[in-house]
Amino acid sequence: MQAEAFHADHNQPQTDTDESADHDACAVQAVLRTDSRAEERSMQGVAHATRCAAPDATAYTAHAGPGQVSWRLREFAMLYRRLGSTGLQLSALSFGAWVTFGKQIGRSEARNLIAAAWDNGINFFDNAEVYARGRAEQVMGDVIADLRLPRDGFCVSSKVFFGAVDSPRPTQRGLSRKHVTDACHAALKRLHVEYLDLYYCHRPDPDTPIQETVRAMDALIRQGKVLYWGTSEWSAAQLREAIAIAEREHLHAPAMEQPQYNLLHRERLEREYASLCEDGLGTTIWSPLASGLLTGKYNAGVEADSRLGQPGNQWLQDEVLGAPEARRLERARAFCAVAAELGQSPAQLAIAWCLRNPHVSSVILGASRVTQLEENLGALNTLDQVDDAGWARVESSTR
């Protein structure tokens, strides 16, 4: 089934009859293309993954378990990976609302982006209470409802810590049981869903015992408001403490971490989290392009209409380009030169590099235009277009 069958016109809602017919067609195609017809395919750097194949071709899987289904939308063969040791399969490329939703782009473009993401096989949409002070979640929720995406076909996340208001009061931020609970309820309302598939502690909270946070997350899971909880930018020691508390008290342990990961920022995932990932921790990584640095767009300076040039993003510009990381731009330029020599888009090559890590469950993409998103999705094809010698050159360019 081509993507247009679900969203033949993104500007017009479907009728119930059309939606039901499309759902039935998908179900029939899925039954016809189970792993009993699949060809096994070896793929370096990919674990627990299901590759989508064209509807008119034989489906194939990469390290997939028995009974998994392969399918494809449009020209991109989306890859699906298990979230760590859970049974949840996320699209290897996901879509996030950081910086853009509720701030840089309008509702119409947000609608086009989510529709394009869905049509190309993305099933995980990432968000947080702090993004545009809650407006990003509101816009995403409105768009998903407007597009009438089937709730059992996608996953949505939120993150808690920073708060969703300017100058938050003490109980409006952090990881206390109160704020973890209040923020969850607010996210559910803004996103127009009855539960969050993934719920992250956006940062560690030095003012709240980890035990209290673990208990709060476990309570939300038992209430059916959250399916999996995790962390973002916690230290390995803090994660191990949370896991130990959960095991000791028979609570739900964190299932995933959301760290920054790219060619210029790799130590935490590859070294600090290594043993945790081996034990089954999933990761949904952010900033695969180092806030655009690895695309080459900042090689000649920061344009006013770029992400780093947006009003209020001076802190991000300082972090990406400024001291003590001044050498980052030099390394990014070297990477872009290698990409050109390999005949690859720098953005696609950088994202594909992230996908080669078997401990990466999903790479969160950000985009302000559909053309950006579609280019980034091409990273799935880049995986097969670069040989070992080429990847070695990529590695050496950023060391």
What are these regions (language model features)?
Residues 7-26, 38:
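Intrinsically disordered, low-complexity, charge-rich segments with an acidic bias
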Residues 60, 65, 69-154, 222:
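N-terminal binding-site loop/beta-alpha segment at the start of enzyme catalytic domains
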Residues 85-101, 157-171, 195, 200:
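N-terminal small/glycine-rich loop or linker at the start of catalytic domains
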Residues 95, 127, 158, 198-201, ...:
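Conserved beta-strand positions
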Residues 97-108, 166-179, 202-203, 207-208:
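Active-site mouth loops of central-metabolism enzymes
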Residues 105-117, 175-191, 239-244:
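Short, acidic/polar
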Residues 188-208:
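Active-site groove signature of glycoside hydrolases
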Residues 208-398:
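Beta/alpha (TIM)-barrel catalytic core signal, keyed to glycine-rich beta->alpha loops juxtaposed to Asp/Glu
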